[in-house]
UniProtKB/Swiss-Prot annotation:
This is DNA gyrase subunit B. Binds two Mg(2+) per subunit. The magnesium ions form salt bridges with both the protein and the DNA. Can also accept other divalent metal cations, such as Mn(2+) or Ca(2+). One of its GO terms (biological process) is DNA-templated DNA replication. SUPFAM superfamilies: ATPase domain of HSP90 chaperone/DNA topoisomerase II/histidine kinase, Ribosomal protein S5 domain 2-like, Type II DNA topoisomerase. NCBIfam families: gyrB, PRK05644.1, PRK14939.1. InterPro entries: DNA_gyrase_B_C, GyrB, GyrB_hook, GyrB_insert, HATPase_C_sf, Ribosomal_Su5_D2-typ_SF, Ribsml_uS5_D2-typ_fold_subgr, Topo_IIA. It is found in: Cytoplasm. GO terms for molecular function: ATP binding; DNA binding; DNA topoisomerase type II (double strand cut, ATP-hydrolyzing) activity; metal ion binding. The gene is gyrB.
Length: 806
């Protein structure tokens, strides 16, 4: 960590104007509908912490996705300055949080290098959050300030003492701005992984309280380590990663790391000033041209082209190549605001010159590595030639087929790809039902016999010789491979994988996804691939049958059924509560149960279910020992009354001296093993806790002496609302036969249309790639040649399996 220089309110330069942010958020943060703007909110805050790391003052960052879809970002940097800003008359922290383009990066002495995508600052995050809490640890004190929709609720105030320093920002994006507030683990992990590789030595912990998942990202070795990570579970062709880093006199910094592996796909990542370029740009063009030139020059010098009687191309050179190009440019030019493509012309020359120099030297100084790489390149050229011949054979056979389409394909009448659907169906029997049940105008059916080839393990020439793969390629019409592929010739823009809900169905679906991910990734990127979602249950009641789509719908159906002819009597003499009134109470109670289930990764339901019946604890009351002691006694009483065999609960108070509060802690002893659960201040301040106690208070106050539920002639005396609902659910379950549905072949054509193929009622999952690096690794681990990584994956994830079908 570097020594502290003067970093106070005088370092904060102000460029005013925040009014437009809420009116046109897309200009500042990206699309507010598709999730990109939502995730960029997190990246803006994380980038501030990375800037502290680049300045040498921070090496530990924590990002938490909370159960209510709020986000916390905490670092151990210097802490945002809290002294009064001379120009603005409020704390410097408040200036940073409320004024657009205010911050230390506009003062060259505070940050020499800074990241960030749009360069708008954390003030935009504040403006677009329904609530944001800023906590700063600095100069031995803890400072805190709360904002609602970007407006400070009170001045910055001291709330405790601390021996550490750093900044903690906890924000909840505004539902008024963002269409869908759901954070994707994959999108956040992808960016955080990149940042940890690009900033060696910085540790970033990503935690997801919704699922209990967490991952710590910290890598020494920069881009070299990044390439090694990308090639995990793959066999390298050149044993050592080629790497160079140079700072040129023209101000452009160039760093490249690369290594070939035994796969058949190229994986090139480009960055400018830590920002990824999805569409490449001038740095990629310079890299590709110099790579091909250097390798072809080496082949010519060694006389390998004549010896092997083959002509190599740039595509052959990049088969199985993993490479990262990172440039540092003082004033980069991009094709758009999202910076997906670099257009600075001077960067092409810089990358080309440095790559020519260093890579040519590498080939000459490492003859064994060079021969292995060139050997792979020549093999790729041979395979390309073999694939061309195989394609010609396929075309000759196809010429005999009048339509040029596979015989098994039942095509649709529609010729507009945007309106056409292709169902890839498992097996001929389900294919027959689908053909009879479909809408012939827009829906085409292609039955796939058996399991298609695993393309992860097969060379290109072998793959296109496979009958099932060949049939699929012909049906799609867009071709495959660099020479043949043309997305404009794709015959269907809706390709739907429809397989059974068993192990074989899952395997076939995985093989098809592997094929699309490896060979036709643009179809996935454009959102053309879908997975059909047939119903999960068939429910019989008497002679009536009904298909139900999933567990949530099943719970809804059974609840509705349980409430038929049911009534709740609040005491012995009270009139019955039934119909819409009872349904409303049940829905409120179910919403509480869902909240508790969501929280169960952090706090066991066996504890939190009692909070429904306990008085509310406010944040102020946490500081009152007597109040907390009385509340704790009630909790302990309930825990004792519900104690199960082999379990023991012991509740106590733990003092948090930093915040001057008393926190409930429960010791759970299960068969002699003790674990501890502490309910922290954030829990009692959360919306989830308030929802639980508010609805709990409402339901508890309803029931009096002699309360009971009744259904028909049967009745059950109850003390708590949950008792009554459980009894009604058990009663209705007895009257239903529930079958978990697995095979498409179990449905007749009409049922298949009504449940799975009718566009007005069907459910489908769109296949997307949010983290291409993680997707590459998972496909390689599960579908590749190496057995050991696959076994490790299965062993480490075995306990997470919720539905194992033998």
């Amino acid at each position: 960590m570097s020594e502290n220089q003067t970093y106070d309110s005088s370092s904060i330069k102000v460029l005013k104007g925040l009014d437009a942010v809420r009116k046109r958020p897309g200009m500042y943060i990206g699309d507010t509908d598709d999730g990109s703007g939502l995730h960029h909110m997190v990246f803006e805050v994380v980038d501030n912490s990375i800037d502290e790391a680049l300045a040498g003052h921070c090496d530990d960052i924590t990002v938490i996705i909370h159960t209510d879809e709020s986000i916390s970002v905490r670092d151990n940097g210097r802490g945002i300055p809290v002294d009064v800003h001379k120009e603005e008359g409020v704390s410097a922290a408040e200036v940073i949080m409320t004024v657009l383009h205010a911050g230390g990066k506009f003062d060259d002495n505070s940050y020499k290098v800074s990241g960030g995508l749009h360069g708008v600052g954390v003030s935009v995050v504040n403006a677009l959050s329904e609530k944001l809490v800023l906590t700063v640890r600095r100069s031995g004190k803890i400072w805190e300030q709360t904002y609602v929709h970007g407006v400070p609720q009170a001045p910055m105030a001291v709330v405790g003492e601390s021996e550490t320093t750093g900044t903690h920002i906890h924000f909840k994006p505004s539902a008024e701005t963002f269409k869908n507030i759901h954070f994707s683990w994959d999108i956040l992990a992808k960016r955080i992984r990149e940042l940890s590789f690009l900033n060696s030595g910085v540790g970033i912990l990503l935690k997801d309280e919704r699922s209990g998942k967490e991952e710590f990202f910290k890598y020494e070795g920069g881009l070299r380590a990044f390439v090694e990570y990308l090639n995990t579970n793959k066999t390298p062709v050149n044993s050592q990663v080629f790497h160079f880093s140079v700072q040129r006199e023209d101000g452009v910094g160039v760093e490249v790391a690369l290594q070939w592996n035994d796969s058949f796909n190229e994986n090139l990542l480009c960055f400018t000033n830590n920002i990824p370029q999805r569409d490449g740009g001038t740095h990629l063009v310079g890299f590709r041209s110099s790579l091909t030139r250097s390798l072809n020059s080496y082949i010519e010098q060694e006389g390998l082209a004549k010896k092997n009687k083959v002509a190599t191309t740039g595509d052959d050179a990049r088969e199985g190549l993993t490479a990262i190009i990172s440039v540092k440019v003082p004033d980069p030019k991009f094709s758009s605001q999202t910076k997906d493509k670099l257009v600075s012309s001077e960067v092409k020359t810089a990358v080309e010159q440095e790559m020519n120099k260093y890579f040519s030297d590498f080939l000459l100084e490492n003859p064994n590595e060079a021969k292995a790489v060139v050997g792979k390149m020549i093999d790729a050229a041979r395979a390309r030639e073999a694939a061309r011949k195989a394609r010609e054979m396929t075309r000759r056979k196809g010429a005999l087929d009048i339509a040029g389409l596979p015989g098994k394909l039942a095509d649709c009448q529609e010729k507009d790809p945007a309106l056409s659907e292709l169902y890839l169906v498992e097996g001929d029997s389900a294919g027959g039902s689908a053909k009879q049940g479909r809408n012939r105008r827009t829906q085409a059916i292609l039955p796939l016999k058996g399991k298609i080839l695993n393309v992860e393990k097969a060379r290109f020439d072998k793959m296109i010789s496979s009958q099932e793969v060949g049939t699929l390629i012909t049906a799609l019409g867009c071709g495959i491979g660099r020479e043949e592929y043309n997305i404009d010739k794709l015959r269907y823009h809706n390709i739907i994988i429809m397989t059974d809900a068993d192990v074989d169905g899952s395997h076939i679906r995985t093989l098809l996804l592997t094929f699309f991910f490896r060979q036709l990734p643009e179809l996935v990127e454009r959102g053309y691939i879908y997975i059909a979602q047939p119903p999960l249950y068939k429910v019989k009641k008497g002679k009536q049958e009904q298909y139900i789509k999933d567990d949530e719908a099943m719970e809804e159906y059974m609840t509705q059924s349980a409430l038929e002819d049911a009534s709740l009597h609040l005491d012995e003499s009270a009139p019955a509560v039934s119909g819409v009134q009872l349904e409303s109470l049940v829905n409120e109670f179910r919403s509480v149960m869902k909240t508790l289930k969501r929280l169960s990764r952090l706090y066991p339901e066996e504890l939190t279910e009692h909070f429904v019946y306990l008085p509310e604890v406010t944040l102020e009351q946490l500081g009152d020992h007597a109040v907390m002691q009385a509340w704790l006694a009630k909790l302990q009483e309930r825990l004792n009354s519900s104690q199960k065999s082999g379990l023991a609960y012991n509740a106590s108070l733990r003092e948090d001296k930093e915040r001057n509060v008393w926190l409930p802690e429960v010791e759970i002893t299960s068969h002699g093993l003790a674990s501890y659960i502490t309910f922290n201040r954030d829990f009692f301040g959360s919306n989830d806790y308030r929802t639980v106690v508010n609805i709990g208070a409402k339901l508890s106050s309803l029931l009096g002496e002699g309360a009971y539920v009744q259904r028909g002639e049967r009745r059950k005396a109850i003390v708590e609302f949950k008792e009554g609902l459980d009894w009604l659910m058990n009663e209705t379950t007895k009257r239903h036969t529930i079958q978990r549905y697995k095979g498409l072949g179990e449905m007749n054509p009409d049922q298949l249309w009504e449940t799975t193929m009718d566009p007005t009622v069907r459910r489908m999952l769109k296949v997307t790639i949010e983290d291409a690096i993680a997707a590459d690794q998972i496909f390689n681990t599960l579908m590749g040649d190496a057995v050991e990584p696959r076994r490790e994956f299965i062993e480490s994830n075995a306990l997470s399996v919720s539905n194992l079908d033998f």
